[in-house]
């Protein structure tokens, strides 16, 4: 009796184990099929591999009010909200102690962050590849040949060609619109910063007449050099942002 009891329990355990293995295998097969179908769909419409959003964009706290900003908005924030701060603070990027002109320190010593931010933004954009464009061209050619050979009606051929064209245009517009909007916002913020820099660093004739008389020759020369450095940096930043790959 005891042996029969243990044999029955062993057989039940084996059946339960086999059932669990079958269920796990079915689940793994379904998951692999769904993943392959998703990849096939992306390949069909020609999307390049897009890096996942696991890389978080670095935020830098304002050392005066402790608000978090990315590097571009931080510069605009310092220019607009804290243009005349003179207390010693730590640079949010390198932790160096800066007594004044924190904005100048960031833009001159950490200008590479602007380019890194732009490259990271471009990597996140999914753009149809050349393979997608070639597939779209072949689809249009096949549809056109079908219409010429009479394998499909004129209306169906026209609708198929229109659908292929619309899908390509839609994919381009949907994927580029978000990056274009973000680029426009960044360029607008950069233009504001540039405008304020030029207003602050390029003195007018009235300013020269009223203020230069109270400054020494060395101080006036130092301010001119700083203005030239800022102007050169702004020009380099704009050119690298617009044309650098």
Curated annotation (Swiss-Prot):
Pfam families xrefs: Di19_C, zf-Di19
InterPro entries: DI19, Di19_C, Di19_Zn-bd
Family: Belongs to the Di19 family.
Record protein name field: Protein DEHYDRATION-INDUCED 19 homolog 4
Organism the protein comes from: Oryza sativa subsp. japonica (Rice)
Species classification: Eukaryota, Viridiplantae, Streptophyta, Embryophyta, Tracheophyta
């Amino acid at each position: 009796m005891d042996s029969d009891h243990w044999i029955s329990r062993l057989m039940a355990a084996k059946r339960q184990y086999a059932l669990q293995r079958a269920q796990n295998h079915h689940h793994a097969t379904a998951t692999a099929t769904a993943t392959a179908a998703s990849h096939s769909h992306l390949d069909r419409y020609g999307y390049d591999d897009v890096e996942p959003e696991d890389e978080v964009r670095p935020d830098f706290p304002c050392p005066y009010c402790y608000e978090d900003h990315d590097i571009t908005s931080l510069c605009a924030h310092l220019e607009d909200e804290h243009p005349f701060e003179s207390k010693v603070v730590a640079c949010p990027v390198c932790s160096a102690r800066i007594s004044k002109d924190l904005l100048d320190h960031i833009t001159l010593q950490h200008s590479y962050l602007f380019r890194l931010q732009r490259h990271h933004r471009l990597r996140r954009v999914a753009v149809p590849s050349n393979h997608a464009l070639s597939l779209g061209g072949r689809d249009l050619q096949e549809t056109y040949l079908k219409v010429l050979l009479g394998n499909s009606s004129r209306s169906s051929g026209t609708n198929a060609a229109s659908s292929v064209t619309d899908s390509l245009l839609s994919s381009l517009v949907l994927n580029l619109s978000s990056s274009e909007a973000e680029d426009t916002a960044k360029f607008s913020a950069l233009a504001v910063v540039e405008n304020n820099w030029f207003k602050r660093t390029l003195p007018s004739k009235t300013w020269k007449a009223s203020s230069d008389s109270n400054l020494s020759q060395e101080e006036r020369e130092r301010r001119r050099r700083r203005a030239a450095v800022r102007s050169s940096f702004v020009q380099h930043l704009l050119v690298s942002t617009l044309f650098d790959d």
